[in-house]
Amino acid sequence: MLYRNRDLDLDARNDDLANSNSDGRITQVTRTLYSKWKLIKMKTYKNLYPKLCSYKNLELAFKKAGKGKSKKFYVIKFKKELKQNLFSLKKELELETYKPSRLTKFTIRDPKTRLIRKSIFKDRIVHHAIVNILEPIYEPRFITDNYANRLNKGTISALERFDIFKRKVSKNGKLVSHALTNNMIKGYVFKADIRKFFDSINQAKMIEILQRKIKDEKVIWLIAKVLKNFDDKKKGMPLGNMTSQFFANLYLNDLDQFVKRKLKMRYYIRYVDDFIILHESKEVLKNCRDKIEKYLKNLRLELHPDKSKIYSLYKGVDFLGFKTFYYHRIARKRNIKGFKKKLITLKIKHKEGSINYNKFMESVCGWFAYVMWGNTYKLRKNIIKNINRFLLDNSLSS
């Protein structure tokens, strides 16, 4: 997949490269890459449904849906008669009699309060089966700097990319002309958040986006079934479904293309509904903000007025759980508070015996692996002391 490596599939430079073909300034390799990109852009897909319904695909979907949940009762129950259950599901899909079950609702605080709607295990297998077919089609069309729910991406990669972009925009840390301290670095960041994103996704628009490439009516029928299994039959997608994560990326891919190709913004990063654009000019970013607000109306979305602002780079930007400055990065207070609450719950569960030592440490280490990307040495040191004291007391009392 050579055409993926240098953003030739999605960057605005594609059009410039094609236009420069006449004066012989581009190489044969570049012309070949551009041709491949054009073919990918124009290609449509039919006869996908038999592959989606195949036993092989459903078996793979079962493995993905059950990953890390092998001890859950619903996975054990489904696995007991795996072949029979998968063939039964296959038949439902082929006869188009499949109907998703009602969603289970529950609230989580991480630390933000979110309403999660969860599908039963059988429906989750169908979700994975759909994504197994669609992901290879759409993955080459996503921009490099879309970091949510993608292989070899994630928050850490997005933060690393942010570090690269801030150095480029500030010309490696040049100071503003009126700098009073060595921290007053050049450059600006437009930090934006889409208001009530998952609840605002227009289902008809989502189908319209899919139909540009997917010309198999049965696949569209199944996706429509999944989308409409929601409180509101016209808009919104449930947080928690595999399909929701994938469709969220696809829905905002139009925005990504607009920012990169039309606005020609090189330093753009998106993670689900949070995105940032870096530039040396505040006026350019103001213009971008206005055009993005207008463009989002086509997607029936709007920017969050309180969370979408332009900041001086040296003042720091809240992004993906950290406030990032030019020379350092600190963890958000609410994230630290949220973890400390979670740690109390983990301690209680470990003391009661509902989770073992390995499970306890797995949860702790997962958070540590993330927060160590900030300047959090003292914080981590204090939490480690707290955990060691708890484990020692717990071992003495048992």
What label would you give each PLM region?
Residues 1-37:
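C-terminal, surface-exposed recognition/capping segments
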Residues 75, 156, 238, 242, ...:
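Gly/Ser/Thr-rich beta-alpha loop segments that engage phosphate groups in nucleotides
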Residues 85, 91-93, 160-161, 165-272, ...:
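Conserved polymerase palm-domain catalytic core
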Residues 96-100, 263-272, 339-354:
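Short, conserved aromatic-histidine micro-motifs
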Residues 140-154, 262-272, 382-388:
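Short alpha-helical "patches" and their helix-cap loops
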